[in-house]
Amino acid sequence: MRTACGYSVVELMSVVSIAGILMTVGVPSFRYVTNSNRVTAEVNSLYFDLELARSTAVAMGLPVTVCPSTDGQTCVPSAEIWQSGWIIFSDSNGNGVVDSGDEVLMVRAAFTSSTDTFLSSQGVSAVTFNREGFAINLPSSSTGFTTITLHTQPQSPAWTRCIQVSTIGMLTTEHAQQGSCT
């Protein structure tokens, strides 16, 4: 008598059906996790660079600015281009522009995802910290802070994150509940 080797068609179809059911349940939640982690990493990148600029300003005793940049050398005067990368530079006169004598301290490359955008609530195109660590040159607002929001396309409250910069230099991050931060 011969012993059977291999799988029957019924066994094979059972395994394929179970794998299909698991994929149907698992893939959407995996997509959520990967998008959420990507957005969190992008927000953390800007958050920690703002913290670095603040601590560098205090350590160096002179203003340090973070601004969007596409070439790694100059600031782009647009509040809607942060996703293209940014630079941190010593800003001796605190005007938010790279002048002669200012030193670029760090360059951050553009996001890997072309669908994510950082937008500022008050059109902030640069954040400057003075030697005391206070944020200067921010537009005045009734709340006392400026919000920079990361949106994905299509916009989803689940993947929207915000960084709030107060005039005293305090930074906080927030997960948007209804698509925008408070």
Q: Which residues fall in each region the model found?
A:
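N-terminal leader/signal peptides at the extreme start of proteins
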Residues: M1-V9, T172
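Short, contiguous hydrophobic alpha-helices characteristic of membrane insertion segments
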Residues: G6-V27
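N-terminal helix-rich module
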Residues: M13, V25-S55, A59, P63-T182
